[in-house]
Amino acid sequence: MRQAPGFTKTPLLGRLPRQISGGQRQRVAIGRAIVRSPRIFLFDEPLSNLDAQLRDEMRGEIKRLHRDIATTMIYVTHDQIEAMTLADRIVLMRDGLIEQEGAPLELFERPATTFVAGFLGSPKMTFLPGKLSRTAAGASIVLDGDGPRLDLPPGRIADRAAEGMSLILGVRPEHIYRADGMAGAPGEARLQAAIELLQPTGSRTYATFRIGGTPVTAELEAHDAGRPGETITLGINLNRVSLFDAATQRAI
């Protein structure tokens, strides 16, 4: 009890299992495992039956527990927020096979496949299909569906990638921003797009646009998000995008 104060509450001790909720049973089960002081923990979606607020609290408790007792924990989850916030290393699997293994930030910033890129992050990464174009000035990607040509920063794509190769450009909402009246920056692409939908969340607003026929989500400042139907100038930080081979769905 001393070791797991967040997982087993004193008012529950006198009750039978049938007298407590599913979420309370999960918390008691975690507490019972902790006080046994095992050499390794295996958690299989331990927070799945908890409501959102309690799930947030228990994530913090598990994080503190891991820090305090320094015991290896294997934590199975379908929740990418739990994976990112709790893990020292993530093993991301698909259909029983490992897609990528590494530190959370490594998987988030350098995803090995489109599956990894789309699984981590909320709102999820947008995928824009296009073709590689090479000129004496450098490489660019021409987006499908009458989309724009985006000039890639030097060294951003491998030399082995051939002219006309089908690519997928992955861009996260936080790397798209409103650029009206702003000076251009190295590695930045600019384009005009009309706001289709706004989803305010407080300090930030998620705006939906279409680029080359594909819906794209941008994370904008709430006070400067605009209004639906308004056409604004978007900036895309091409230094932070991911590029994938369309045929293999793997990063290049």
Language model features with spans:
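C-terminal boundary and immediately downstream tail of ABC-type ATPase nucleotide-binding domains
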Residues: 110-132, 170, 237
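Short, conserved beta-turn/loop elements at beta-strand boundaries and strand-helix junctions
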Residues: 136-138, 198-203
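Structural detector for short beta-strands of small beta-barrel domains
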Residues: 126-134, 189-196
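Glycine/charge-rich catalytic "coupling/switch" loops of P-loop NTPases
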Residues: 139-140, 144-196, 215, 224-252
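Conserved coupling/switch loops of ABC nucleotide-binding domains, chiefly the family-specific signature
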Residues: 95, 129, 241
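ABC ATPase nucleotide-binding domains
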Residues: 1-115, 119
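Glycine-centered loop/turn positions within well-structured domains
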Residues: 81, 105, 114, 126, ...
